[in-house]
Amino acid sequence: MENMEDIKPTTLERIHSAAKREFLEKGFLGASLRNIVKTAGVTTGAFYGYYDSKEKLFDALVSEQYEHIMDMYVSTQNSFKELEAEKQQANMGKIGGDCLEQMIDYMYANEDEFRLILMCSKGTRYENM
């Protein structure tokens, strides 16, 4: 049985870890691909074996969480639209509040990714979220 200390992160895991730190510290625009690969201990060529741009790397770090929270919102919105008008009026506050609470819980459970989206994404497709 392998000891936890014997398990080494994969190249992709090292790239993701280094990129997350770099983006959180400097934002997307200030982040250096050179620093990311150096911190990850890989070559630029190895990086380009996985991603063809810094933006694709950023997207890989946050797209799952972004899509999930948008799906939560759209699903709640669609369910609300299916209610009869009087039920919409009677339940608007509760439905909206419940959705917001679930979204905030999800954001806290994925704090680094949402810090990237909300505070470090200038220059990416997420900057106006």
Question: How should each PLM-predicted stretch be described?
Answer:
Residues 83-129:
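Short secondary-structure transition hinges
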Residues 31, 56-60, 116, 124:
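Alpha-helical transmembrane segments and their helix-entry boundary regions
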Residues 26-29, 110:
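Short coil/turn segments at alpha/beta junctions that flank glycine-rich nucleotide-binding fingerprints
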